[in-house]
Amino acid sequence: MENTEVKVGIADLNLVSSPGKIMTIGLGSCIGIALYDRRSKLAGLSHIMLPDSTQFKNVTNPMKFADLAIPLLIKKMEAKGCLKRNLIAKIAGGASMFSFSDKSMVGDIGKRNIQAVKKSLSEERIQIIAEDVGGNKGRTMILDALDGKVTLKIVGIGIVEL
């Protein structure tokens, strides 16, 4: 079997089977949602930018939003034979990358993304077993389909495993 490495861009999602890896870079206020099925060794990763699609009239990319991307990722994994009840989640990102004196104007998008991702996963009844969220550092997230291990490369900190 070939050990593939799949890259997921911003506002994108994808799947990889064992022994492959799937990764996303540039997680600032964005969130990486890693879903893993231990039985089938299928890994899914989503890189969301915004919490809620209902604020927009024309949604051209559902993968941009937590409320749409997570159900879409689950459906793609189910189409490959996963059972939703076997999925576990690990999340990373949601940093406050900029300091604004008046947060009411822009809101803390990182914090809102964290809340939206947790809400969506809870509604889908998928347990978050590990997280590294908040703070003010950018992250790269790598999910290994062999064992579900997530490796984070955090700017100014180094490597963290979830």
UniProtKB/Swiss-Prot annotation:
Enzyme class: hydrolase
Chloroplast is among the record's keywords: no
Top-rank lineage group of the source organism: Bacteria
Annotated Gene3D superfamilies: 3.30.1330.200
GO molecular function (one): protein-glutamine glutaminase activity
Keywords noted in UniProt: Chemotaxis, Hydrolase
E.C. code: 3.5.1.44
Family of the protein in this entry: Belongs to the CheD family.
Role description: Probably deamidates glutamine residues to glutamate on methyl-accepting chemotaxis receptors (MCPs), playing an important role in chemotaxis.
Protein name from the UniProt record: Probable chemoreceptor glutamine deamidase CheD
Species of the source: Clostridium botulinum (strain Alaska E43 / Type E3)
